[in-house]
Amino acid sequence: YDAQGETFCALDHAALIWEQGHSIAIMGESGSGKSTLARLMIGLERPSEGRILINGVDTTKWSLREWRKYRGKIQAVFQDAGGTLNPAWSTSKNVEEALVNLTDLSPSQRKNRIAELMEQTGLSKNLLDTPVRRLSGGEQRRLALLRSLSISPEFLILDEVTAGLDLISTEAVLQLLEKYEQEHDCAYLVITHDLQIASRLCEVIYEIEHGKITKKAVR
């Protein structure tokens, strides 16, 4: 993209392997290209040049219908979770909207699914009817995680998902992610500055610098 009249390459031949059931982490300094890579993978941004290959398919040529089918399998939780939620809707409606669009669950099944995940993410059931704009930043991030997990994705991008959470909330989120991965064979792409979190959740850790993958470590 262009910055102050100069062309800046956010990513340059950043290739990595991410397979179902195998979680990976991306670590690097701010501005290294971590979040840009995640947003490109889920179609929230388009590359100015080059291609994005997922299972050998160039997603830059996908139609809106193809992206919708893909998003039933992959979800993302970004650090600014509030930007992906409707602030005027209640917590339950934000989650139920995803369940209506991307699952075949009945109304009663949707209600039970939301209640179950509210408990697992440490969100009080008293917040079910609370507008999202009245939630704290940490509560919004846990709600975004809850919504993503509710549709049982095969792949989940986690962009600094525990940043700013207290120790108790962080541990609750990590335990939930570990349990979900084991039960559903889900693969995470974890973007974090915390090596302990990366090592706990992931088998492979990539380091990115100036838009390029520079290191790879296998746990």
Predicted regions and their residues:
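Conserved ABC ATPase "signature" region
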Residues: 109-126
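Helix-to-loop junction immediately C-terminal to a conserved catalytic motif
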Residues: 42
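Conserved ABC transporter NBD signature motif
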Residues: 50-58
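ABC ATPase NBD coupling module
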Residues: 59-75, 93, 101
